[in-house]
UniProtKB/Swiss-Prot annotation:
This protein's UniProt keywords: Coiled coil, Endoplasmic reticulum, ER-Golgi transport, Golgi apparatus, Membrane, Transmembrane, Transmembrane helix, Transport
Superkingdom field: Eukaryota
Cytoplasmic-side positions: 32-116, 179-204
GO CC field: endoplasmic reticulum membrane; GET complex; Golgi membrane
Pfam families given in the database record: CHD5 (PF04420)
Coiled-coil boundaries: 78-113
Intracellular or extracellular location(s): Endoplasmic reticulum membrane; Golgi apparatus membrane
InterPro entries: Get1, Get1_fungi, Helix_hairpin_bin_sf
Name of the coding gene: GET1
Identification of the protein by name: Golgi to ER traffic protein 1
Gene3D superfamilies associated with the record: Helix hairpin bin
Function noted in UniProt: Required for the post-translational delivery of tail-anchored (TA) proteins to the endoplasmic reticulum. Together with GET2, acts as a membrane receptor for soluble GET3, which recognizes and selectively binds the transmembrane domain of TA proteins in the cytosol. The GET complex cooperates with the HDEL receptor ERD2 to mediate the ATP-dependent retrieval of resident ER proteins that contain a C-terminal H-D-E-L retention signal from the Golgi to the ER.
Membrane-spanning intervals of the chain: 12-31, 117-137, 162-178
Species this chain originates from: Lodderomyces elongisporus (strain ATCC 11503 / CBS 2605 / JCM 1781 / NBRC 1676 / NRRL YB-4239)
Membrane topology: Multi-pass membrane protein
Length: 204
């Protein structure tokens, strides 16, 4: 099969960056990324009138809500009620517009999901197919046990050589452990389970 003669340093850096981005996407979550892309699309890129109206009405709701919080319902009841009715009307209109643009959101979400998959998987498969026989690193003979040198060289190289398969395995392991160490202090503490007390048997 065809292989490409690419500089090993380029392969090392490229594969590391792609795997790092994969881990970052996993940490953030595809759904959050889709939400961010949708927000950018609706705010800056879309030419849909429904989306423009949706954004305007959302802004109106935000402004009216601020006004309502500054008014006392007891002291200025009429004004407060008027704003409240306007808010109810706007929320109903926003709900209707949201149903209208739901199809477009589904389309953008699908495109975003496909783009993420292609960006993160195609380069890796390209490297695996066309650079699989490129030696990336060399280990001085005898520095490791012979069986370990042989294992690290799998599946295409002689002992003492590190290829893409081994490099990607190591990078994935290091990144996973690094993410765990960074995120562990911020994880929610699990309460220690309380052992139930055995009910004392009452003498009959």
């Amino acid at each position: 099969m065809l292989t490409l003669d690419i500089d090993p340093y380029t392969i090392l850096v490229t594969s590391f960056l792609i795997l790092a981005i994969q881990k970052l996407v996993t940490v953030i979550g595809k759904q959050k990324i889709q939400l961010y892309i949708w927000q950018i699309y609706t705010k800056y890129l879309s030419h849909s009138q429904s989306i423009k109206q949706f954004n305007l009405k959302q802004k109106e709701i935000k402004d009216l809500t601020k006004q309502q919080k500054l008014i006392s319902a007891q002291d200025e009841y009429a004004k407060w009620t008027k704003i409240n009715r306007a808010l109810d009307k706007l929320k109903l209109e926003v709900q209707e517009l949201n149903e209208t643009i739901a199809g477009e959101k589904t389309r953008i979400d699908s495109i975003t999901k496909l783009a993420i998959t292609l960006i993160l998987t195609l380069p890796i498969w390209f490297l695996r197919i066309f650079c699989r026989k490129t030696a990336l690193l060399y280990i001085r003979k005898g520095i490791l046990p012979a069986y370990l040198e042989w294992w690290l060289a799998l599946p295409f190289f002689k002992s003492g050589t590190i290829g893409l398969t081994c490099w990607m395995f190591v990078v994935n392991s290091v990144l996973s452990n690094l993410i765990f160490l960074i995120s562990f202090p911020f994880t929610q503490k699990v309460e220690r389970p309380i052992k139930p007390k055995n009910e004392q048997k009452t003498e009959s």
